[in-house]
Amino acid sequence: YWSGYNQIMASNLMDSGLSPDEIINYLIENDVNNNPTIRQYGVVDIYEGGRSAAYTGGNCMDYKNHILGTNYAIQGNILLNEQILINIENNFNNTIGTLSDKLMAALQGANIPGADSRCLDNGTSSLSAFIRVAEPFDEPDNFLLDLNINNTNNNQEPINLLQNLYNEWLNEQDPLGDI
């Protein structure tokens, strides 16, 4: 369960110079609802060698886990199986480009019917999808990139819809595209 308070705390702790491991430990010990077992956290510090840390609470719904690597922390719960996380990791690592390019490719790794096991009957990967990238001095309501497909209808694939929005966003950033 997402908590805006916990997210703000994590951001403030990162700004104060704590390591990803220290931030995760703080969040577990100081959960806003005193129930970290229902949470998943991932923290990456791309400015200090790509350090990463994660936590998956025991009361998150199965399949649940996380994968860590340099410059990434991948978390998932209510997943069809472990392969979803592996696909996400492979897409992230095998994509050349900006952080946003790598994140969008990672999301495509979960573009499998039932990746969120609640959506198998719909034939979609999930109910919604979003991508958010912030630069160091972005304001909370004005990120470099903040795209969201929320609760799609008619069995539309949210990751494909998000990919379309992302492609439009890319074209707005560089209207000439690749030359």
What are these regions (language model features)?
Residues 1-179:
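N-terminal nucleophile
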